[in-house]
Amino acid sequence: MKKIAEAWPIVKGDYTVGNPESRIAVVTLASQINSLPEAALWGSSKTENLGVEKIIINTISNSNIRYILICGKESRGHLAGHSLLAIHANGIDEKGRIVGSEGAIPFIENISREAVKRFQQQVVLLDRIGLTNLEEIMKIVREYKDQGEVYPEEPLVAISQKKRQSTFTIPHSGDIIVSEEFVMDSAAGVVCTTNDF
């Protein structure tokens, strides 16, 4: 069985790659804490939406990761750590809102409910929000880095291919005069020369 997706980690972020075979990843929230090579991934997450999405995507694309240590100081207003705990415990509603999150904008837009469910099943979250002592963090990483079995399913690559669609509207009227040479079609939001009409 394949354990790690090709080109893992799938999405870029503010993290360091350590041992991809490790059972633990470390999220330092808004704190910058020196990384240990024993963790699969080690990095910060300051937002309750894109930051949480990146953690989920990079976790479920490596079946070796079974624990996530959440440590460091919370980011004010965004509450990325609280939101990570909430999505793990409660998931998302039909609008993509993280159920139970108190973050400013707790909406997940780029991954599916299936990806969230896989995340909930694959990992155990170790809630040590506020912990910044490197020795204590090292002790936890060393305790969990080899603990447990690989998740019994192949990695899940859950990245949205959703691209912003550009829209082009042909102007129909020059209903706002900008100057003698230019008019604007307010419905299309396009500025044209008066010769175009």
From Swiss-Prot:
GO biological process per UniProt: methylation
Transmembrane segments: none
Lipid biosynthesis among keywords: no
Enzyme class, broadest EC rank: transferase
EC number: 2.1.1.-
A single GO molecular function term of this UniProt record: methyltransferase activity
Entry superkingdom: Archaea
Keyword field: Methyltransferase, Transferase
Known partners and oligomeric status: May be part of a complex composed of 3 subunits; MtxA, MtxH and MtxX.
Similarity annotation: Belongs to the MtrA family.
Protein name per its UniProtKB record: Putative methyltransferase Mtx subunit A
Gene encoding the protein: mtxA
